[in-house]
Regions:
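Nucleotidyltransferase catalytic core that binds NTPs
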Residues: 1-181
Length: 181
C-alpha cells in the first residue's frame, strides 16, 4: 500500500499507469470506512489493475460546519481495513488545501433537478459540492471505473449525470449495498 497526500504524487503514478495501459479503479470515500466501503474496494480489486481509494472529508458537502467538524476521522483504522482487502490498493488522503483554494469554491452543475429532491431538498448545494470533488478526483485519477454503493441512489444518479456533463470516459460501477454484520 502506498499513501499519497499530494496531487503531484498521484499525477506521476497515474501517468505511469496510463502508459502501461493498465485499468484504474477509483473508490472515493470520506473515510470512517465500514463494510460497504470495503465491498466497493473488493469489487474494484477484482475488476481493475490499479485501485485507488480516496479518504477526504469534503468540506463543500456540508451545510452545517459542526457536522464537518464532528465528522469521524481515523486514518490509521481506515488504512488497516484497506490493508485487509489488499496490499496493492493506493490511498490518497490530502489536506483540504491540496484540493481547494482558500475560498472553497464549488462548481454549479445542471443536474436536471436531481439535486433538488430527496436529500438535496434539505441540503442546499450539497450535490454541487459532491460534483465538484468528484470532478476534481476524476480529472486527477482519470479512472476507467469508479465504484459507488447503490445505497446512495440519489448520489449515483448525480454522478452519472456529472459523467455526461463533463464527458468523462469513466464507467460508473454501482455495487450492491453491504451492511455491517
Amino acid at each position: 500500500m502506498q499513501l499519497y497526500t499530494l496531487k503531484s504524487q498521484v499525477e506521476t503514478s497515474v501517468q505511469k499507469t496510463i502508459r502501461l495501459e493498465k485499468t484504474i479503479g477509483l473508490v472515493p470515500t470520506m473515510g470512517s470506512l465500514h463494510q460497504g466501503h470495503l465491498s466497493l474496494l473488493k469489487r474494484a480489486v477484482e475488476s481493475c489493475d490499479i485501485v485507488w481509494a480516496t479518504i477526504f472529508v469534503n468540506p463543500t458537502q456540508f451545510n452545517n460546519k459542526n457536522d464537518l467538524k464532528n465528522y469521524p476521522k481515523n486514518i490509521k483504522n481506515d488504512l488497516e481495513l484497506i490493508l485487509k482487502i489488499s496490499k496493492n490498493i493506493n490511498v490518497f488522503s490530502p489536506e483540504i488545501s491540496e484540493m481547494y483554494d482558500s475560498e472553497l469554491k464549488t462548481e454549479t452543475f445542471d443536474f436536471q433537478n436531481l439535486d433538488k429532491e430527496l436529500e438535496g431538498k434539505y441540503r442546499n448545494n450539497h450535490f454541487n459540492g459532491v460534483g465538484t470533488i468528484v470532478s476534481k478526483l476524476f480529472e486527477l485519477f482519470k479512472p476507467n471505473k469508479a465504484f459507488f454503493g447503490e445505497k446512495d441512489f440519489q448520489q449515483t444518479r448525480i454522478i452519472n449525470r456529472l459523467i455526461k456533463i463533463k464527458n468523462y470516459s469513466t464507467e460508473l460501477v454501482i455495487c450492491p449495498t453491504v451492511r455491517e454484520q
